[in-house]
Amino acid sequence: MEYLSALNPSDLLRSVSNISSEFGRRVWTSAPPPQRPFRVCDHKRTIRKGLTAATRQELLAKALETLLLNGVLTLVLEEDGTAVDSEDFFQLLEDDTCLMVLQSGQSWSPTRSGVLSYGLGRERPKHSKDIARFTFDVYKQNPRDLFGSLNVKATFYGLYSMSCDFQGLGPKKVLRELLRWTSTLLQGLGHMLLGISSTLRHAVEGAEQWQQKGRLHSY
C-alpha cells in the first residue's frame, strides 16, 4: 500500500500507455498481409502469368523472375495504365486484378481492336456498335497446377459486364477427383452387373420351369 501511494499517477498512466502501445505494435507487425492472386503481363501483353503476393515489392520481385525482366520495374493497371506506385494503393486493389509490368523506357498502351478481337478476319466497321464482347484469359496461379485457370469476361452493349473465374486444380486435387469419379463409375457398373445377373438368373429359372412343365404334359 505504501508503494502504491508513492507512485505518481502520471508515471503510472505513462507506463500503461507505453505497454499498450508496445503490445499493439507487436500484434500489428505479427500479422502480415495475406497472399492474394494477381495477373501480370508484359508491355506487349504477349506473356501473362498468375502470381500471388502479399505486398507490392513481393509482386514486383516475382514478376521480375517469372517474366524474365531486368532493371527497374514499374507497375501499372493493364486496363487504363494507372501507376500503382504505393503500397497503400496496392492493398486497395481487388483480387485477380490485371497488372502490367514495365521496364525502363517502356510505356503503357491501350488494347488494340482488330482481327483477334472480332475473330472474323476483318476489321470492325466504323459505324458498328458492340452487342457483346467475350474475353478469355488462361493463366496459372501456381506452377504446380496441371491445368491453368480460365477467366471469362463478357461485356454487353459496352455497359454491362460480368466475369466468371474457373480455378485450376493441382496434381493432388486432380488425382483425388479422378479416383472419386472412378469409384463412382465402378459402383454404378457393379450395380448394373448385379441387375443383369439377376435378370439372367430369372430367365434361366423360367426356362427350366417351362421345360419341366412341357415334359409333364408329354407324359
Curated annotation (Swiss-Prot):
<comment type="similarity">
    <text>Belongs to the CIDE family.</text>
</comment>
<protein>
    <recommendedName>
        <fullName>Lipid transferase CIDEB</fullName>
    </recommendedName>
</protein>
<comment type="function">
    <text>Lipid transferase specifically expressed in hepatocytes, which promotes unilocular lipid droplet formation by mediating lipid droplet fusion. Lipid droplet fusion promotes their enlargement, restricting lipolysis and favoring lipid storage. Localizes on the lipid droplet surface, at focal contact sites between lipid droplets, and mediates atypical lipid droplet fusion by promoting directional net neutral lipid transfer from the smaller to larger lipid droplets. The transfer direction may be driven by the internal pressure difference between the contacting lipid droplet pair.</text>
</comment>
<feature type="domain" description="CIDE-N">
    <location>
        <begin position="34"/>
        <end position="110"/>
    </location>
</feature>
<dbReference type="InterPro" id="IPR003508">
    <property type="entry name" value="CIDE-N_dom"/>
</dbReference>
<dbReference type="GO" id="GO:0048471">
    <property type="term" value="C:perinuclear region of cytoplasm"/>
</dbReference>
<dbReference type="GO" id="GO:0090207">
    <property type="term" value="P:regulation of triglyceride metabolic process"/>
</dbReference>
<dbReference type="GO" id="GO:0030137">
    <property type="term" value="C:COPI-coated vesicle"/>
</dbReference>
<dbReference type="Pfam" id="PF02017">
    <property type="entry name" value="CIDE-N"/>
</dbReference>
<keyword id="KW-0333">Golgi apparatus</keyword>
<keyword id="KW-0597">Phosphoprotein</keyword>
<keyword id="KW-0945">Host-virus interaction</keyword>
<dbReference type="GO" id="GO:0019915">
    <property type="term" value="P:lipid storage"/>
</dbReference>
<dbReference type="GO" id="GO:0005783">
    <property type="term" value="C:endoplasmic reticulum"/>
</dbReference>
<keyword id="KW-0472">Membrane</keyword>
<dbReference type="GO" id="GO:0005794">
    <property type="term" value="C:Golgi apparatus"/>
</dbReference>
<keyword id="KW-0551">Lipid droplet</keyword>
<dbReference type="GO" id="GO:0008630">
    <property type="term" value="P:intrinsic apoptotic signaling pathway in response to DNA damage"/>
</dbReference>
<dbReference type="GO" id="GO:0034379">
    <property type="term" value="P:very-low-density lipoprotein particle assembly"/>
</dbReference>
<dbReference type="GO" id="GO:0043065">
    <property type="term" value="P:positive regulation of apoptotic process"/>
</dbReference>
<keyword id="KW-0256">Endoplasmic reticulum</keyword>
<dbReference type="GO" id="GO:0120013">
    <property type="term" value="F:lipid transfer activity"/>
</dbReference>
<comment type="subunit">
    <text>(Microbial infection) Interacts (via N-terminus) with HCV non-structural protein 5A (via N-terminus); this interaction seems to regulate the association of HCV particles with ApoE.</text>
</comment>
<dbReference type="GO" id="GO:0042981">
    <property type="term" value="P:regulation of apoptotic process"/>
</dbReference>
<keyword id="KW-0968">Cytoplasmic vesicle</keyword>
<comment type="subunit">
    <text>Interacts with DFFA. Interacts with DFFB; inhibited by DFFB. Interacts with APOB. Interacts with PREB/SEC12; facilitating loading of SCAP-SREBP into COPII vesicles.</text>
</comment>
<dbReference type="GO" id="GO:0005829">
    <property type="term" value="C:cytosol"/>
</dbReference>
<dbReference type="GO" id="GO:0031667">
    <property type="term" value="P:response to nutrient levels"/>
</dbReference>
<dbReference type="GO" id="GO:0030127">
    <property type="term" value="C:COPII vesicle coat"/>
</dbReference>
<dbReference type="GO" id="GO:0070300">
    <property type="term" value="F:phosphatidic acid binding"/>
</dbReference>
<dbReference type="GO" id="GO:0005811">
    <property type="term" value="C:lipid droplet"/>
</dbReference>
<keyword id="KW-0053">Apoptosis</keyword>
<dbReference type="GO" id="GO:0042802">
    <property type="term" value="F:identical protein binding"/>
</dbReference>
<comment type="function">
    <text>(Microbial infection) Involved in Hepatatis C virus (HCV) assembly and required for HCV entry into hepatocytes.</text>
</comment>
<dbReference type="GO" id="GO:0097194">
    <property type="term" value="P:execution phase of apoptosis"/>
</dbReference>
<dbReference type="GO" id="GO:0005789">
    <property type="term" value="C:endoplasmic reticulum membrane"/>
</dbReference>
<dbReference type="GO" id="GO:0160077">
    <property type="term" value="P:lipid droplet fusion"/>
</dbReference>
<dbReference type="GO" id="GO:0090110">
    <property type="term" value="P:COPII-coated vesicle cargo loading"/>
</dbReference>
<dbReference type="GO" id="GO:0006915">
    <property type="term" value="P:apoptotic process"/>
</dbReference>
<dbReference type="GO" id="GO:0060090">
    <property type="term" value="F:molecular adaptor activity"/>
</dbReference>
